[in-house]
């Protein structure tokens, strides 16, 4: 089913199920003998959502890479582990630069407010659908987990007036901020909402602020991309999952985040899927690996150096 303006979802279906899939991949990566990331909260969060395949993948009963490769997504666990590490390093660099305010947009099952070693005085805001925020904070509280920063969850849809909700939660636009938009700028918002999101981030960012994001679309317009999307949709459906890959994304021209930020005076650095995998110390992507949907996604880190 195609996405519509104002549609809704939860962590067991549609866009929400992709967040659960990514968390299952982080859990699988954490279980490896030589893990590049450690996310002890990924498995219990996935288990609480209750999608059988991802629960078994998170616990090690099922090889998620094997399942995903059969659907056309090779090296899924490496992909999301390397992505998580890339963004973890972004926060480490922001901390080293003296930033003490963070905003994570569309946080999903991201547990960074709980798992990263934030310095004293760090304020971490995270924004997502109210039901997602409530589910995650309640589940982690039941596990006895506590945030490692001054944590401010903000439950609101990114298509709504989230800047006002963020300010109401205590966000200070006069302080440099480290912004993270992980897994949201890949077609899950309408093109106009993507641009509006960037405009809002720019407006709320003091000099010295930083942003990290991935961007592109997991569902291209080419016949090959459409065929792969259909293959993945049918494969996930065979596993009892509601993830219509073509229907998850909005059509239209999506914003090149790096170019947009540069046009507004931000200094940017870009990377691709292969760069992240190599930086993580993992095996280089083969030609076959580069046929994965992940290879269509770009990555950017940016710094606001002037008003």
From Swiss-Prot:
Name the species this protein comes from: Mycobacterium ulcerans (strain Agy99)
Please give the Gene Ontology molecular function terms for this protein.
methyltransferase activity
| Alphabetical list of InterPro entries matching this protein | Ppm1/Ppm2/Tcmp, SAM-dependent_MTases_sf, SAM_mthyl_Trfase_ML2640-like
Q: Which family does it belong to?
A: Belongs to the UPF0677 family.
Q: What is this protein called?
A: Putative S-adenosyl-L-methionine-dependent methyltransferase MUL_4430
- What's its job? Exhibits S-adenosyl-L-methionine-dependent methyltransferase activity.
* Amino-acid positions noted as binding S-adenosyl-L-methionine in the UniProt annotation, renumbered to this chain: 128, 157-158
Q: Name one GO biological process term.
A: methylation
Q: Does the keyword 4Fe-4S apply?
A: no
**PANTHER family given in the database record:** S-ADENOSYL-L-METHIONINE-DEPENDENT METHYLTRANSFERASE YKTD-RELATED, S-ADENOSYL-L-METHIONINE-DEPENDENT METHYLTRANSFERASES SUPERFAMILY PROTEIN
Under Enzyme Commission nomenclature, its number is 2.1.1.-
Pfam families recorded: LCM
Per UniProt, the keywords (alphabetical) are: Methyltransferase, S-adenosyl-L-methionine, Transferase
- Identify the Gene3D superfamilies for this entry: Vaccinia Virus protein VP39
